[in-house]
């Protein structure tokens, strides 16, 4: 039995993993890659072109695990908007969560927002201005889904009081200055957001794909946020450019993590 078989067995034996099962699982490239990272033989992994997001995440959760103090791993996209777009910062925005958490609770949504801001700052190189989105702007609608966003906004501000963040905001109020001024005149974020946090995975996944296909924006990711080591997923509809850019993102994540 090789070192990697033994390592995976030790990680999963409490869950009923056998030595024979570990040997078989390690032949799966998703698990082998994560074990190489865990053992210090690799710095990051890019996968998903031929695998489902669920399979990629399962291997990462079992072997890499979340960062210390982090309970929510989420997925963000760095959106590279068409030249001349009036939105975002230098043609860039971050969308989250578009890949991992189906229906986040208010505390989970708050953590996704804070993680997305970090992604914008570290990988996008711009100062994040975070909007937590809803179908309501500042009380324009009453619903339990709106209440969740309001609570998430409150928690996120407590988690990161220095962060430029607001909610609940409708999408147009978040990114269009005139609409933001009209609908949320007291908000410092309305009309100028460059990080959009969606209330559910359903909304986030649909939105990033529509923006990508209808506007010609490039969607780099999903960038997995909150893992102890860089593991990133690709859409099975990805192009070679998507793979190339995600590899660069993963390398940057590794370099930055090693500098801390």
What are these regions (language model features)?
Residues 4-190, 195-260:
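Anion-binding alpha/beta catalytic cores of soluble intermediary-metabolism enzymes, centered on
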């Amino acid at each position: 039995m090789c070192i990697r078989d033994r390592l995976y067995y030790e990680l999963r034996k409490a869950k009923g993993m056998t030595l024979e099962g570990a040997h078989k699982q390690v032949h799966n490239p998703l698990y082998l890659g994560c074990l190489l990272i865990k053992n210090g033989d690799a710095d990051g992994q890019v996968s998903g072109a031929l695998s489902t997001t669920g399979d990629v995440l399962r291997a990462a959760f079992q072997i890499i695990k979340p960062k210390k103090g982090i309970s929510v791993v989420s997925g963000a996209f760095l959106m590279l908007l068409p030249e001349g777009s009036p939105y975002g910062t230098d043609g860039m925005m971050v969308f989250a969560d578009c890949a991992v958490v189906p229906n986040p609770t208010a505390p989970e949504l708050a953590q996704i927002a804070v993680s997305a801001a970090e992604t914008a700052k570290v990988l996008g190189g711009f100062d994040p201005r975070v909007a937590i989105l809803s179908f309501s702007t500042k009380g324009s609608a009453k619903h339990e889904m709106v209440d969740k966003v309001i609570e998430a906004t409150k928690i996120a501000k407590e988690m990161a009081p220095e962060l430029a963040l607001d909610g609940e905001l409708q999408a147009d109020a978040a990114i269009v200055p005139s609409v933001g001024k009209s609908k949320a005149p007291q908000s410092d974020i309305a009309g100028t957001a460059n990080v959009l946090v969606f209330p559910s995975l359903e909304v986030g996944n649909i939105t990033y794909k529509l923006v990508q296909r209808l506007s010609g924006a490039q969607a780099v990711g999903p960038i997995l946020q909150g893992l102890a080591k860089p593991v990133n997923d690709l859409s099975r509809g990805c192009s070679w450019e998507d793979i190339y850019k995600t590899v660069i993102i993963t390398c940057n994540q590794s370099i930055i993590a090693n500098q801390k």
